[in-house]
Amino acid sequence: ATSVASGVINPVTGRRIVQTWMIDTLLPFAIDAYKAFQQEENIKIIKATPIKLIHPSLQMKESFDYRLTHDNIYLNENNHSSLGQYFNTPFGTGEIDQCYWIDLIQFLKAGREKISTHFIEDYFDISDLILTEQGVQWKNIIAEKIIFCDGLNTMNNPYFKALPFVPNKGEALIVKIKGLAPTNIYKTNITIVPWKDDL
C-alpha cells in the first residue's frame, strides 16, 4: 500500500480545516528526519510542495475562511484564478503552506537497502507467533515486542478483531495534465500530486 500512497505531509485536515494533531511538534521532527536520511543516502526524497486548495463547496470555503482568520498559520488566502482552466472553481481557491511531498518509492528502496543486513524476507503466518512471558517468539526470533504493519489486512488479524475498522483503500491514477504546474499539490474532491517527469 505504501508504494501507491501519495506521500503528502499536510498540516491541516478534515472538512473543518483544522490543524493536524501535534503538527507543530511532529512537522519539524519529520522534516529533520527526512532531510538527514536523504543526506546520509545521497538521494532527494523530501520537497516543500504547497497545496492549492480548490474549494469543492460553499461549506468548505466558509470553513477555510473561518480558519484563515482565526487559528491556522498554515493557510494562505491566495486566490489562484489561473486554476480555472484546469478545475471547476465556483467557490474559489486557497493555499495550504508548509506541506511536503515524500518520494516514498525512493525512500522505501533506500531504507530497505540500508537495513538489508537486519532484514528477513519471509511469509509471516500469525499462527506461528508465540506469546511468552518475555514477549514474543516467531520461528527462531525472540523479541520483547512485535509491530504489525498489515495495512488493510489488519482487519483479519486476531489481535485486533475487536476494533471497529472502516476500510479505506485508496487508488492511484497516473495522468499527465499539460500546462498544470508540477510544483504544487492540487486538492478538491480528489488530490493531484506531482510525481516525476510531469506525471
Task: For each feature predicted by the language model, list its residue ranges.
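Active-site substrate-recognition segment that forms the wall
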Residues: A1-S3, G7-V8, T13, K44-I46, ...
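Dinucleotide-binding Rossmann-like beta1-alpha1 core, especially the glycine-rich loop
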Residues: G7-G92
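A structural motif corresponding to the C-terminal end of an alpha-helix
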Residues: F37-E41, E113-F119
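A conserved short coil-to-beta-strand element within the FAD-binding core of flavoproteins
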Residues: F119-G135
